Regions:
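Structural recognition of the conserved hydrophobic beta-strand(s) that form the central parallel beta-sheet
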Residues: 144-150, 171
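A cross-kingdom feature that marks ATP-driven nucleic-acid transaction machinery
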Residues: 1-22, 27, 50, 59-60, ...
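Conserved catalytic segments around the Walker B and adjacent sensor/switch elements
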Residues: 70-85
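Conserved catalytic/switch belt of AAA+ P-loop NTPases
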Residues: 130-146
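Conserved glycine(s) of the Walker
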Residues: 56
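Pre-Walker A adenine-sensing motif
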Residues: 24-41
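Interdomain motor-coupling "hinge/lid" segment immediately C-terminal to the ATP-binding subdomain
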Residues: 4, 8-9, 158-265, 269, ...
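Short glycine-rich substrate-engagement loop in P-loop NTPases that contacts/grips substrate
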Residues: 81-113
Length: 452
């Protein structure tokens, strides 16, 4: 076996010699999505870790290794290896790494009572990796595999049928507002969903000023962990442009997709950023970038699978109507919008409103399908969440003054769908108003973003 590969394996696993699996493990901030990884440690299935670029996937893996060690797992039963710097991309490299670990490191081999844990990063660089993981799954019952890659599109595309039924796909998104606050050292108590309880714990009052002061910064910077304390904002823009946007469009996607003009795709992203939270028609966008509608539609699909963009559909019982009706565009993180459009904390109210609605949609769509609603008369509701009892309509008005007319779309939606309660999200107002038999709950954006 190549001595350089052995040396790289050993260097990548400082926990074997009694050190932490990575530097600064003591300052890693707990995250819900990362905690979820550990909950799959005892399951037979492979765990495929996906998520946007720079969202914290590798940190999540390191944190999971540390938590296993804290649980009493022998460090020599854990392996971390990243394939981004290996000279060969052949499947034999992956096989050699696993064989060396099992045969030379794991004490007394992997058993049911003492399994071994593989954490394989940048797995997309290895040819035919799904087949190798399938073979490990089928022949090494006591070896648990976690695999991830910075190119989530490449990883998801590679999974194919080989790992069907053999793998869980866990997404680590960019930071939620709650996680962003935790990164800044602001601990917020658990707050229930506003549709079940409008009250917040009394202890929240101790941090409310810090929370409201941090909100604009979160909207403008977005949720990329490495930008939380980055200054000035122009550096944040440069980081997102170079480390996320350029890397995905000009590198990751070219390895997995047929893209004739990546510069046009970046132009399309910029147009989508200017329209985030608004309705769009692909036939109207395509001519602006000198592209056929069919090509633009293909690029949109690729951007969505690359976790840079998402399509929001009109809330209707008919999936045929849903597919044919107009849609709304949302970029996957508000930091992408700011980087593409050059927004900062002095951004005007219209742009902040777009960021606010994008943040609300992205937050809610993490845990539930999310739609918008528009009727033939032009009445609209920004976000609709399906619910067993009745759908939950939510309107965003990121402003300080609220009028009954702001709830017009909510009232119409409730009349059509038999709801008796709706939600109006504002910049800083809270309370309630009744319009006929409909109760409109008014709440500030931070309240929505912090609910658990």
């Amino acid at each position: 076996m190549d001595e350089r590969l052995v040396r790289q394996i050993v260097i990548s696993n400082p926990q074997w010699s009694g050190r932490p699996p990575a530097e600064h493990m003591d300052v890693i901030v707990p995250r819900d999505s990362i905690a979820e990884l550990l909950s799959y440690a005892d399951d037979r299935q492979i765990v495929i870790v996906t998520g946007p670029r720079r969202s914290g996937k590798t940190t999540g893996i390191m944190s999971t290794i540390q938590q296993l060690l804290d649980r009493g797992v022998d460090p020599k039963r854990t392996l971390y290896f990243s394939f981004d710097e290996v000279l060969s991309r052949e499947h034999t490299v992956l096989e050699d790494v696993v064989s060396y670990f099992i045969q030379n490191v794991v004490p007394e081999g992997a058993t049911k009572k003492a399994p071994a844990f593989l954490f394989l990063d940048e797995i997309q660089f290895i040819k035919d990796w799904p087949t190798i993981l399938k073979r490990i799954y089928e022949t090494r019952a006591n070896v648990k595999v976690f695999a991830s890659g910075s190119s989530s599109l490449g990883v998801r595309k590679g999974m194919g049928e080989s790992l069907a039924g053999r793998a869980f796909d866990i997404t680590i998104p960019t930071l939620s507002f709650r996680e962003y606050l935790a990164f800044k050292g602001i601990e917020v108590p658990k707050i229930p969903p506003v549709w079940s309880d409008t009250k917040v714990p009394e202890s929240f009052m101790l941090v409310q000023n810090e929370v409201t002061n941090a909100l604009t910064s979160y909207l403008v910077r977005g949720g990329y962990p490495e930008t939380v304390d980055m200054r000035p904002i122009s550096k944040v823009h440069r980081y997102i442009q170079q480390s996320v946007l350029d890397r995905v469009v000009y590198h990751d996607l070219l390895e997995t997709e047929s893209i004739a003009n990546p510069a046009s795709m970046m132009h399309l992203l910029k147009i989508l950023a200017s329209m985030s939270s608004q309705r769009f028609e692909i036939a109207n966008i395509a001519p602006d970038i000198g592209m056929k509608a069919q090509t633009a539609s293909k690029y949109l699909s690729i951007l969505e699978r690359a976790m840079l963009f998402s399509t929001c559909y009109n809330y209707t019982k008919s999936q045929v109507k849903q597919a044919r009706s107009s849609k709304r565009a949302y970029l996957a993180d508000t930091g992408l919008i700011s980087a593409l459009l050059g927004l900062d904390e002095t951004t005007g109210s219209q742009e902040l409103g777009r960021l606010a609605e994008t943040a609300a949609y992205n937050h809610l769509s993490r845990t539930s399908p999310a739609f918008f609603w528009r009727d033939p008369q032009g009445n609209e509701v920004d976000i609709v969440l399906p619910s067993k009892r009745a759908p939950i309509p939510i309107e965003l008005k990121y402003q300080t003054s609220i009028y009954k007319s702001d709830a017009k779309g909510l009232v119409r939606f409730c009349d059509v769908h038999g709801c008796d309660k709706a939600f109006l999200v504002t910049k800083d107002k809270e309370g309630a108003m009744n319009i006929g038999d409909i109760e409109i709950i008014i709440l500030p954006l931070w309240r929505l973003l912090l609910q658990t």
